[in-house]
């Protein structure tokens, strides 16, 4: 059974620390990390300094930058780390610092949310879950192992609560992302479609996991990024680079305004095409991480999924509705899949839903 927190859940300790960070005149207050969230907080809170052990810069927005060992032990620290939030929290706890993170600050602060930088891929989740509980339950019941169900529950509890306590146990494990040894079988002469290849950062893992690969299609809308990938992997004749976005239909030479009118996601591409149009051979594996355009790309791969029954590794962290609409789309096209869920990062990013063909055992 899906074991979720009550929707009125509050982390009382974090709430109290956020209030102290906002309103205390006696507590020393520091922000750990320098990014857009740091600047957002500084507009509303008078702080005593910024912590960054790795910068040579001595100040930011007229505030001194300190090493962690220079900070008073009774200080309250707000971490803005997005890449390793659990590692940072555990390190601060070990050193004895009271600490909170930006998600707690965003949730419990009484500052108008429109005045704060919005954390990505999470603020739409609570309302969507409330309105579509039945759909989430359906997906939970489709998951094929207990590990998937545990991950499903933990990540949803986190997204509802903004509380990193629910993410304890997750680590940054990018090498296994898309290639989970528990799920993905060995495939000889694989044809691999890398949707959202960026600068080719997944290519080394494809080659490592499938050294006798037949073909890799790298599809990336950003011209600069795909040119970097081409340069880095130019020695491979069987890697093809395609400079376009993926969607549910072919659209050419779109202006920025047309993009806004046609796309309900952040996948900005002047030219969009479908997987069915682009690939004219059997595809064994499709990976998609394309900034919220995954639903459209799957619709545009209808024939490929129906006829090839490729393994699918699809990122579902960009939009709340991806959690249930992506499995709906895939199973409507081809019901002969087992569904699994894995999460490969300490924080918000890198939740992957796997669709493994029933006949893959």
Question: Would you name each region that the model predicts?
Answer:
Residues 1-47, 53-75, 79-361:
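Phosphate/nucleotide-binding beta-alpha loop and adjacent structural elements of enzyme active sites
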